[in-house]
Swiss-Prot record:
Protein name: Orotidine 5'-phosphate decarboxylase
Superkingdom: Bacteria
PANTHER family the UniProt entry points to: OROTIDINE 5'-PHOSPHATE DECARBOXYLASE (PTHR32119:SF2)
Gene name tied to this protein: pyrF
One Pfam family matching this protein: OMPdecase
Native organism taxonomy: Bacteria, Pseudomonadati, Campylobacterota, Epsilonproteobacteria, Nautiliales
Keyword annotations: Decarboxylase, Lyase, Pyrimidine biosynthesis
């Protein structure tokens, strides 16, 4: 299991300061919509300058018509990030288009499909999709697997179910991780490290418990020790 730290702070200075404090660790860093829209490609370069071995997960959740998604995926692949994501609900054709486009690169990034956002609870989800989170997450994951993607973004609770219907090597990345039982915040389906391990999760994304800590490096050290 690998750790991905969310760079979700209000300014580029704070995010870079956090990255610098973690430069000695073999970790992934997640750059989301807010940070990328505000700070752009330059921010990605600055992260790599701090530690060229940092792995970057660009969390933009592409969702559009197939050709537009493929065009955007090609531009992302040119950025040199190691992983990015798209929405599975865009459909299998869109997912296949993305994979065909990124596979042209010598070192293509990993591509993950978002199944069900961890901010949904069951009631909210049913009101939109008229189905359970588990059923829909499995359906989206199966389609992503068949489309040739590398894995999915899901909650801890769907991770092992998804591997059972796809492959043990099909990546599951889970947000909403509260390593040692911290407050859930705006996430609904959260879990700790032990449950993530039990459910065969490959990547855990941790944000607030790290960047709101007095000593983020200490928290990262503790998490890595428990992986």
């Amino acid at each position: 299991m690998q750790l991905c730290v969310a760079l979700d702070l209000p300014s580029i200075e704070e995010n870079l300061s956090l990255a610098k404090s973690l430069k000695n660790y073999d970790i992934w860093l997640k750059v989301g919509l807010r940070s990328y829209i505000r700070d752009g490609k330059e921010f990605l370069k600055q992260i790599k300058q701090i530690n060229p071995n940092f792995h970057i997960f660009l969390d933009l959740k592409l969702y559009d018509i197939p050709n537009t998604m493929a065009d955007a995926a090609e531009e992302i692949a040119k950025l040199g990030v190691e992983m990015f994501n798209i929405h599975a609900s865009a459909g299998k054709e869109a997912m296949q288009s993305v994979m065909q486009r990124v596979q042209k690169f010598q070192n293509p990034p990993l591509v993950l499909a978002v199944t069900v956002l961890t901010s949904f609870n069951e009631e909210q989800f049913r009101s939109i999709y008229n189905d359970s989170i588990e059923n829909k997450a499995k359906q989206f994951a199966k389609e992503a697997y068949e489309a040739g993607l590398d894995g999915v973004v899901c909650s801890v609770y769907e991770s092992d179910l998804i591997k059972n219907i796809t492959s043990d090597t099909f990546i599951t990345l889970t947000p909403g991780i509260r390593p040692f039982g911290e407050s859930a915040g705006d996430q609904k389906r959260v879990a700790d490290i032990n449950l993530a391990k039990e459910k065969k999760v490959d990547f855990i994304v941790v944000g607030r418990p790290i960047y709101q800590a007095n000593n983020p490096a200490e928290v990262v050290e503790k998490i890595l020790t428990n992986l």
